[in-house]
Every structure is written in structure tokens, then in C-alpha cells.
């Protein structure tokens, strides 16, 4: 039987340091380059980071199939893609969740979900979770925005109410993209991602790296 989803449960932390304000060493920092990857997609192809070299801006976001913060905000994300796709912004989704924690997050369900909803992004499967570790993915959804040189310029949430996107008052991702495309620095480059934690293989469903626990 799969574990019951409780989006409001605090992550399971493994050290007393979790209660202290410490540097976020687990996830990418502003200015870091996008780590390489090569992953299978729901369209039957395999994609590497270099396949998106022609795009001026690359938005990589970690997502899944089951999380209510994902399903509650997917249509808002779709609108963001449609708004910025004509400006050279490319969106790439990655599912790194363990299928042994939530069977809905397996690859066949990814294919089915894309077929049903027709989302305007590439949907990649990170079964080994190596890409999630390289990027330091914390939540689903968790967004990373990279400039033409593939340096990180924004990381965190897309909106402040992903579970009920119609109630969103702050559109952090849109603002970051608008500022960057206008040639301006991103005024708020880091926000806490809001969502379900990544489901790590062999870990409790609510486990997160200790150094992340105070910052999500």
C-alpha cells in the first residue's frame, strides 16, 4: 500500500542542524552552470542539455504526476510557457520521483499524463535520480532558470499558491523571466519552492536532506 500523501507534513530531517539557519549547499546557487544530463522523454526520444543550446533561456523544473501542488499549477505553468515561448524561452520538465514511493510517478504514467494533457514542454525521466542530486531538487515543482550561458539566474517557486493557482498573488517565475528578457537583473533570484518533497529511493516519503530542511 502506498503511503498516504500529506502535503503539509514537515520533511523528515536527520540531524539537529536542520533547525539552524545554514547555507543551502544541497541545491544549485545563483551563477552556477546547469549540470549536464541525458534522459529519456515521454515522446520516445532521449535529450541532453546540449539539445537545448539554441534556446536563449532554459527553464528546467522538477515535477511529477501525483503531487497536488503540481496538478494544481500545471495550467498556470502552461500559460507561462505560452507567454514566453516566442521570446526564446524553453521549458524542460524532469520527474525524478521514486516509483516505489508513488507508483503514479512511473514512466508509463508520465506518458499517459502527457498524452492526456498535451503539456507544451519536454517531460524527462530521471529514474536513477542522479540529475535531481546534481541540481539539488527539493520540491515538486522546483524551477531553475538559466541564461544563454546556462548560468542560474533564478531558482524556486513559480507562484505563491501552486496548490490553488487561481488564488496566486505573486508570480515569481514570470517576474524573473520578464526582468531577464528586458535586460535587467532578476530582483528576487531565490525563493523557496512550494510543493511535495522529491521522493527519494529507499527513503521515507517525507525525507529531505538535512541541509535543506530549514529552507523549504
How would you name each of these model-derived features?
Residues 2, 6-189, 204, 212-216:
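Chalcogenol-based redox active-site neighborhoods
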Residues 192-204:
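A short, charged, Gly/Pro-tolerant segment at domain boundaries
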Amino acid at each position: 500500500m502506498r503511503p498516504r500523501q500529506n502535503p503539509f507534513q514537515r520533511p523528515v530531517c536527520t540531524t539537529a542542524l536542520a533547525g539552524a539557519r545554514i547555507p543551502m549547499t544541497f541545491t544549485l546557487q545563483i551563477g552556477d552552470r546547469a549540470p549536464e544530463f541525458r534522459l529519456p522523454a515521454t515522446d520516445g526520444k532521449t535529450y541532453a542539455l546540449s539539445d537545448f543550446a539554441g534556446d536563449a533561456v532554459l527553464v528546467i523544473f522538477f515535477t511529477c504526476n501525483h503531487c497536488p501542488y503540481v496538478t494544481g499549477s500545471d495550467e498556470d505553468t502552461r500559460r507561462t510557457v505560452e507567454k514566453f515561448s516566442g521570446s526564446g524561452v524553453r521549458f524542460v520538465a524532469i520527474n525524478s520521483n521514486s516509483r516505489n514511493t508513488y507508483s503514479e510517478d512511473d514512466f508509463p504514467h508520465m506518458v499517459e499524463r502527457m498524452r492526456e494533457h498535451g503539456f507544451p514542454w519536454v517531460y524527462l525521466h530521471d529514474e536513477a535520480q542522479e540529475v535531481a542530486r546534481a541540481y539539488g531538487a527539493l520540491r515538486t515543482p522546483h524551477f531553475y532558470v538559466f541564461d544563454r550561458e546556462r548560468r542560474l539566474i533564478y531558482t524556486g517557486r513559480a507562484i505563491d499558491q501552486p496548490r490553488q493557482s487561481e488564488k496566486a498573488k505573486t508570480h515569481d517565475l514570470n517576474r524573473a523571466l520578464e526582468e531577464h528578457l528586458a535586460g535587467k537583473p532578476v530582483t528576487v533570484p531565490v525563493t523557496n519552492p512550494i510543493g511535495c518533497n522529491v521522493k527519494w529511493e529507499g527513503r521515507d516519503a517525507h525525507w529531505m536532506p538535512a541541509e535543506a530542511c530549514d529552507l523549504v
